[in-house]
């Protein structure tokens, strides 16, 4: 039986990985989240990092946001091109899972061909 979690090799874990995507990635705003996307060095690698500031809310709210985003990314990951993405919330509301999945599936490929512009 397979584990229904986002594997560790599908996550950005180190600070330098986040900094690389923040500096070199293209910013794309969706209704619920802000994305920074950079093409992956390896065509099949799809990784996600999630950042949530303390302004978003208490720890349980930040953790819930991260769980929802991880699960949405896990569901759409097979349909995405090779990329590394950093996802941050817009506003203080919890995202809707289905809407977030659709936004990720639509916005990440849109951001990839033009990854040279980093303005948000």
Curated annotation (Swiss-Prot):
Q: Share what the entry says about its subunit structure, partners included.
A: Consists of a catalytic RNA component (M1 or rnpB) and a protein subunit.
**PANTHER family cross-referenced by the UniProt entry:** RIBONUCLEASE P PROTEIN COMPONENT
Organism name: Chlamydia trachomatis serovar A (strain ATCC VR-571B / DSM 19440 / HAR-13)
EC numbers listed for it are: 3.1.26.5
Q: What does this protein do?
A: RNaseP catalyzes the removal of the 5'-leader sequence from pre-tRNA to produce the mature 5'-terminus. It can also cleave other RNA substrates such as 4.5S RNA. The protein component plays an auxiliary but essential role in vivo by binding to the 5'-leader sequence and broadening the substrate specificity of the ribozyme.
Q: What's any one GO cellular component for it?
A: ribonuclease P complex
User: Which UniProt keywords are present, listed alphabetically?
Assistant: Endonuclease, Hydrolase, Nuclease, RNA-binding, tRNA processing
Q: Which GO terms describe its molecular function?
A: 3'-tRNA processing endoribonuclease activity; ribonuclease P activity; tRNA binding
Catalytic activity line of the entry: Endonucleolytic cleavage of RNA, removing 5'-extranucleotides from tRNA precursor
> What is the name listed in the Swiss-Prot or TrEMBL entry for this protein?
Ribonuclease P protein component
């Amino acid at each position: 039986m397979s584990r229904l979690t986002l594997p560790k090799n599908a996550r950005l874990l180190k600070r330098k990985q986040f900094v690389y995507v923040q500096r070199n990635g293209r910013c794309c705003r969706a209704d619920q989240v802000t994305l920074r996307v950079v093409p992956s060095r390896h065509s099949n690698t799809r990784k996600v990092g999630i950042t949530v500031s303390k302004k978003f809310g208490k720890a349980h709210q930040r953790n819930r946001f991260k769980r929802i985003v991880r699960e949405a990314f896990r569901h759409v990951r097979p349909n995405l091109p090779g990329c590394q993405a950093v996802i941050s919330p817009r506003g203080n509301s919890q995202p809707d899972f289905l809407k977030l999945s659709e936004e990720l599936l639509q916005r990440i490929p849109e951001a990839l061909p033009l990854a040279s512009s980093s303005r948000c």
